[in-house]
C-alpha cells in the first residue's frame, strides 16, 4: 500500500513559517486592521470629534444667527436657501424640455414628413409637455419667472398654439403673500402699519400679479384707493433669478442654436428694473394722463404720493372688466366694436404721435367701464414699463408704414434700413402682422397649397430670419412691437370687430403728416403752401390706404365665392381669410 511522503520536522517547520501569498481572511484582517499605535489613534479621535462638532455646531450657529438677526437679514438667508431650490427646478425643466425636443426631432420623427399627421401629432404632444412644464415651473418659482411667462403670451403669432393656450394661465396666476409680509414692508418703507396710514385696509388682495399684489383700501377722507404692494423679496432675488435664466437660455441655445432668445433677457434687465420702481411708475402714469387728456374715454388712476414709495403705489380705485372679456363688456351695455376701436386708437396715438408708449398693455392692465356718456371708457393700469420712441425712429416707422401701404419697395427698404433692418420685407410682415405681398394671392387659378401654407406658417418657417430682424432693431422698437402685437391679440380675442390695420395706418397717416408739416415749415415761407403740401400728401396716403383695404376685402370675398363654388379648399381658404381680417 502506497503512503504519502512526509517531510522531516525541520523542513515542515520551515515551510509553515513561510508567508503565504493569499492568507486566510482571519489572518488578513488581523494583519491589516490591528489596533494602530497610540499616537495615530489619538489624532484620528481628534479628527472625529472636530467633524462631529462641525456637523452639529454649524446648523446650531446658523440657527442662532438667524433668530438673532434683523428681519431683512433673515429674509436674505431664506432667499439664499430658496434660490438653490429655484435653480434646481429651473435646470431640471430646461434639460427636460431640451432633451424632449431633441429626442422627438432627431429620433422619433427621423424620416417623417413635416406635414404628415404623425409629425403634427407627435410635435403637438411635445409642445404641450414643454408648455405644461414651463407653467408649472413659473408658478412654483414665482416673481420674474411668471413675468417672463406673461410676456410670451403676446407672441401668439410666433409660438405654437399649445404654448399660447397653456401660458394664458399665467396672466392671472401669482402667489399671494401673507399679512405679516405686508406689515413688514410698510414698516420698512413708512415706519407705520397699513391700518395707521389708511382708514381701512383689506389684507386680502383683490388681485395678484407677478411683481406685486393689489389691496383695496380707503383714505381717511373716504377716498377708495388701490394699494399696489411689491413682493418684499423681489429686489433681493432679482440678480440670482436673472443669472439662472441666462444660464438656462444658453443651455437651450447649445442644443437648439436657432433658439436665440438670450439677447432678449439682456434687454429685459433694464426694463424690469424700471418696473420694480413704483415711484417711476407713478411718474409714467401722470405723463400718460397728460399726453392722452384729449382722449376723454381714457382714464388714468390718480396717484397719491403721500402713500407711495418705491415698493408701494397708492392710486384711485377704478372698477371694470378686462378688455378681452366680451361677456363683461356686453353685460354693461357696451359695444365690443367701440371698445376695440378705442383700444387701437389709444395705443396708435402713443406709437405714432407722443412716442411715450405703454409697453405692457395685456388684458389685465386695461379695464373697461361705462362712462358718464353711456359709452365705454378704458382704464389703463400698470404704468411701470414705458418706452420712449424718439422723433427719428418714429419718423422712420411712420414712413415705413406709409411705404408699405403705397407699395413703394424702395422706400420700404430705405426706412427699414434706417431702423437697422436689412430684410425689409420680412420686417414689414412682422410689423403689420399680415401679408405685405398681397399680389401673391391674386391669380386666374386657385390659391395653391404652398401659398396658403405660407400665410399660415410664415412665422414658423422664417423663425431664424425673424430672430435676426429682432436682434437688428433698435431696442425701443422691441417694446413697440410688443405693444402692437398685444393689441392685435386682444382685437383677435374680441372677434376682430374692427379693422386694426386700417385704424393703425390712419393714425400713421396723421403722425407722418405732423412730422412732414414740421419739416416743411423751414422750406415754405407761406403757411398756406405748407398746409396744401401736407394735405396733398395725406390725401394720397388716405386714398392708397382705402384702396388697400378694398383689395383686402375683395380678396376675402373672392375666396369665399371660390369656396362656395367648390373651386378652393374650404379649410385653407378660411385660414387665409382669417389672416386678412387680423
Curated annotation (Swiss-Prot):
Disulfide bond sites: none
Q: How does it sit in the membrane?
A: Single-pass membrane protein
Matching InterPro entries: ABC1_dom (IPR004147), ADCK1_dom (IPR045307), Kinase-like_dom_sf (IPR011009), Mito_struct-func_regulator (IPR051130)
Q: EC no.?
A: 2.7.11.-
Q: Where is the Protein kinase domain?
A: 179-419
Name a single GO cellular component: membrane
- Full protein name: Uncharacterized aarF domain-containing protein kinase 5
Q: Which organism is it from?
A: Mus musculus
Recite the lineage of the species.
Eukaryota, Metazoa, Chordata, Craniata, Vertebrata
Q: Which gene encodes it?
A: Adck5
Amino acid at each position: 500500500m502506497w503512503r504519502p511522503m512526509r517531510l522531516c520536522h525541520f523542513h515542515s517547520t520551515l515551510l509553515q513559517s513561510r508567508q503565504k501569498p493569499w492568507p486566510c481572511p482571519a489572518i488578513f484582517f488581523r494583519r491589516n486592521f490591528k489596533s494602530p499605535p497610540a499616537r495615530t489613534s489619538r489624532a484620528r479621535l481628534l479628527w472625529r470629534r472636530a467633524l462631529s462638532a462641525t456637523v452639529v455646531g454649524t446648523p446650531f450657529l446658523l440657527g442662532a444667527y438667524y433668530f438673532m438677526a434683523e428681519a431683512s437679514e433673515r429674509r436674505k438667508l431664506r432667499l439664499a436657501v430658496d434660490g438653490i431650490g429655484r435653480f434646481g427646478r429651473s435646470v431640471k425643466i430646461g434639460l427636460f424640455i431640451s432633451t424632449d425636443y431633441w429626442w422627438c426631432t432627431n429620433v422619433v420623427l427621423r424620416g417623417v414628413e413635416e406635414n404628415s399627421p404623425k409629425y403634427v401629432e407627435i410635435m403637438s404632444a411635445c409642445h404641450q409637455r414643454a408648455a405644461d412644464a414651463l407653467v408649472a415651473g413659473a408658478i412654483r418659482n414665482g416673481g420674474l419667472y411668471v413675468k417672463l411667462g406673461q410676456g410670451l403670451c403676446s407672441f401668439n403669432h410666433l409660438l405654437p398654439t399649445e404654448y399660447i393656450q397653456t401660458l394664458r394661465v399665467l396672466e392671472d396666476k401669482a402667489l399671494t403673500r401673507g399679512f405679516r409680509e405686508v406689515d413688514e414692508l410698510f414698516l420698512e418703507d413708512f415706519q407705520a402699519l397699513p391700518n395707521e396710514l389708511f382708514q381701512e385696509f383689506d389684507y386680502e388682495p383683490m388681485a395678484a400679479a407677478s411683481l406685486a399684489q393689489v389691496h383695496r383700501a380707503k383714505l381717511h377722507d373716504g377716498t377708495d384707493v388701490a394699494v399696489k404692494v411689491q413682493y418684499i423679496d423681489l429686489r433681493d432675488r432679482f440678480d440670482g433669478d436673472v443669472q439662472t435664466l441666462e444660464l438656462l437660455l444658453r443651455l437651450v441655445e447649445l442644443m437648439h442654436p436657432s433658439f436665440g432668445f438670450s439677447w432678449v433677457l439682456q434687454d429685459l434687465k433694464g426694463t424690469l428694473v424700471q418696473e420694480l420702481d413704483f415711484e417711476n411708475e407713478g411718474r409714467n402714469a401722470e405723463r400718460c394722463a397728460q399726453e392722452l387728456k384729449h382722449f376723454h374715454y381714457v382714464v388714468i388712476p390718480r396717484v397719491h404720493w403721500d402713500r407711495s414709495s418705491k415698493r408701494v403705489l397708492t392710486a384711485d380705485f377704478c372698477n371694470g372688466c378686462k378688455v378681452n372679456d366680451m361677456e363683461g363688456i356686453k353685460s354693461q351695455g357696451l359695444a365690443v366694436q367701440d371698445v376695440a376701436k378705442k383700444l387701437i386708437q389709444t395705443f396708435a396715438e402713443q406709437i405714432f404721435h407722443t412716442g411715450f408708449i405703454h409697453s405692457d398693455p395685456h388684458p389685465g392692465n386695461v379695464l373697461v367701464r361705462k362712462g358718464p356718456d353711456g359709452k365705454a371708457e378704458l382704464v389703463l393700469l400698470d404704468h411701470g414699463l414705458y418706452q420712449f420712441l424718439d422723433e427719428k425712429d418714429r419718423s422712420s416707422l411712420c414712413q415705413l408704414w406709409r411705404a408699405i401701404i403705397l407699395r413703394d419697395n424702395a422706400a420700404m427698404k430705405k426706412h427699414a434700413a434706417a431702423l437697422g433692418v436689412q430684410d425689409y420685407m420680412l420686417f414689414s410682415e412682422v410689423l403689420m402682422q399680415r401679408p405685405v405681398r398681397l399680389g401673391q394671392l391674386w391669380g386666374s387659378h386657385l390659391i395653391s397649397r404652398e401659398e396658403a401654407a405660407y400665410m399660415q406658417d410664415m412665422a414658423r418657417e422664417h423663425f431664424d430670419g425673424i430672430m435676426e430682424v429682432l436682434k437688428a432693431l433698435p431696442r425701443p422698437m422691441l417694446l413697440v412691437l410688443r405693444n402692437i402685437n398685444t393689441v392685435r391679440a386682444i382685437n383677435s380675442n374680441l372677434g376682430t370687430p374692427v379693422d386694426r390695420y386700417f385704424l393703425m395706418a390712419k393714425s400713421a397717416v396723421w403722425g407722418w403728416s405732423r412730422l412732414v408739416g414740421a419739416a416743411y415749415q423751414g422750406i415754405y415761407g407761406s403757411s398756406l403752401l405748407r398746409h396744401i403740401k401736407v394735405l396733398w400728401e395725406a390725401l394720397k396716403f388716405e386714398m392708397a390706404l382705402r384702396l388697400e383695404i378694398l383689395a383686402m376685402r375683395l380678396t376675402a370675398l373672392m375666396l369665399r365665392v371660390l369656396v362656395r363654388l367648390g373651386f378652393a379648399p374650404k379649410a385653407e381658404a378660411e385660414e387665409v381669410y382669417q389672416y386678412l381680417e387680423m
